[in-house]
Amino acid sequence: MTLTAYLLILTAYLLGSICSAIIFCRLAGLPDPRQNGSHNPGATNVLRNGGKLAAIGVLLFDTLKGSLPVLIAFRCDLSPSAIGLIGLAACLGHIFPIFFQFRGGKGVATAFGVFFSISIIASTTMICAWLIVFLLTRFSSLSAVIMALTAPFYIWCFKPEFTFPVALICCLLIYRHHDNIQRLWRGQEERLWDKLKSK
């Protein structure tokens, strides 16, 4: 790989390490998402804690963390493997942020930003699948897991050269949702819609 690729991998990790959920909650006077709700510093938990505008900000910021480094990598005409590693680095930064004691979120929005920059068509299909599962079940976690399971197939259909790095990112997402998967299996997972209606 080139020096540009290595620099972008480092930049993507550091950008991913900026935990927007903590920052937006502090600015909005909301409780630390790591200490409330699901204890996950992500947009869904910020929404659970009552910060609708903050949640939108977190969602957009986290998506851009994945999207921007990959777009820059495309502009630099890097190889698919290098671009994939840059996207993976952004997700690793979000999940294991160096600026926040390596306690980060689950990486769904950041991963989606990566997928969006790789293929708009594939990522649009993914978000449609996410919405269908969410509307049917009201489980945000299940929607994310289904998206992670199907994303490599969608990428393979439209940008097959990125299938392997996308599959690596999806394995990371599923790993980060292992607690949610266990709660879903036991019937103990909380529906996002029910939580919002109770506020």
Swiss-Prot record:
Alphabetically ordered keywords of this record: Cell inner membrane, Cell membrane, Lipid biosynthesis, Lipid metabolism, Membrane, Phospholipid biosynthesis, Phospholipid metabolism, Transferase, Transmembrane, Transmembrane helix
Transmembrane spans: 5-25, 54-74, 82-102, 114-134, 154-174
Catalytic activity: an acyl phosphate + sn-glycerol 3-phosphate = a 1-acyl-sn-glycero-3-phosphate + phosphate
Keyword check for Cell membrane: yes
Molecular function via GO: acyl-phosphate glycerol-3-phosphate acyltransferase activity
SMART domains with a match to the protein in the record: G3P_acyltransf (SM01207)
Cell compartment(s), UniProt: Cell inner membrane
Superkingdom of the source species: Bacteria
UniProt keyword Transferase present: yes
Recorded GO CC terms: plasma membrane
A GO BP annotation: phospholipid biosynthetic process
EC numbers for this chain: 2.3.1.275
Membrane topology according to the record: Multi-pass membrane protein
Pathway: Lipid metabolism; phospholipid metabolism
Subunit structure: Probably interacts with PlsX.
UniProt function note: Catalyzes the transfer of an acyl group from acyl-phosphate (acyl-PO(4)) to glycerol-3-phosphate (G3P) to form lysophosphatidic acid (LPA). This enzyme utilizes acyl-phosphate as fatty acyl donor, but not acyl-CoA or acyl-ACP.
Recorded family membership: Belongs to the PlsY family.
Protein name (record): Glycerol-3-phosphate acyltransferase
Species lineage: Bacteria, Pseudomonadati, Pseudomonadota, Gammaproteobacteria, Pasteurellales
